[in-house]
Regions:
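Short, basic interhelical loop/turn and adjoining N-cap
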Residues: 29-42
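Short, amphipathic alpha-helical "recognition" segments used to contact nucleic acids or chromatin
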Residues: 4-22
């Protein structure tokens, strides 16, 4: 099984979502096929370190 390919656009949304305390499980639920490790890679700066957080979440992104 292969992970979903992580893009710069996804990384920007992930950064904003985590800044807003959105749980990893909601992020990986939104991006089906993406695992917690890729979210952690983005947040630790191992993937897309120079990409800033998105300005807003997608309109269909899960929120509390």
């Amino acid at each position: 099984m292969h992970d979903r390919k992580l893009t710069a656009e996804m990384a920007a949304v992930i950064k904003l979502a985590r800044n807003l305390d959105v749980p990893y499980s909601w992020i990986t639920g939104y991006y089906a096929g993406l695992n917690f490790g890729r979210v952690a890679d983005v947040m630790k700066g191992r993937k897309f370190p120079n990409i800033p957080p998105a300005k807003h979440l997608p309109s269909d992104f899960p929120t509390a």
